[in-house]
Amino acid sequence: KGLDMVKEGGLLAYITSQGVADSPQNEIIRQAMLSSARLVSAVRLPNNLFTDYAGTEAGSDLIILQKDSQRGALNPIEEQFCNTARLPQGMLQNEYLSQRENVICTDALAGTNLYGQPAMVYTHSEGVEGIAKEVKERILSDFKKHYLSPETAQQSQTTQIKLQEVNSQKNEVRLVLEIAKEGSLILLS
């Protein structure tokens, strides 16, 4: 429903529990998310991200979508994002997020999720600042590969991102990506 509030080409960022991406029962939800949007970035966050502020260790994901009501078929990365894979340890995990490059962590151990089900437990030893640095790097890399500027969306050319202030009269998107000192992620358009 969040995508209904976003204009064409706009961005929507979700922080969700890992269950949204990992559960085979949620495959239909992931497909619905991508029926009118493109996957710009999906990052598995460490379980200890919210420990200092909320006193909880819960696995979560950052998912960034770009509204595209006229999109065609899913690309290979989006297909992976819709699929659940069984890891060698018997755990179920999102196929795309099971790749190490999409996980922000310094340690990964077999454990359980909040419901006692077998799951990978990811932690980061460098605190919020270390986590923020890695999240920023991952998102910037993903934006360079997967973000469609208004021009490229209309012309179906290569993806690009502009990380500078642009002239709003040209109907271009201004995107500012900043990791605040507290480690919060700010996306403006």
Show where each model-derived region lies.
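Context-gated lysine
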Residues: 1, 7, 67, 133-136, ...
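Ordered hydrophobic segments in well-structured contexts
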Residues: 11, 41-42, 62-64, 103, ...
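Flexible, glycine-/basic-rich loop-and-beta segments that form/coincide
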Residues: 52-156
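Charged, often flexible domain-edge or linker segments that flank or initiate folded functional domains
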Residues: 144-189
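Conserved Class I SAM-dependent methyltransferase catalytic core
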Residues: 1-51, 58-65
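Weak global preference for isoleucine
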Residues: 15, 20, 28-29, 64, ...
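Generic hydrophobic/packing signal
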Residues: 14, 26, 37-38, 134-135, ...
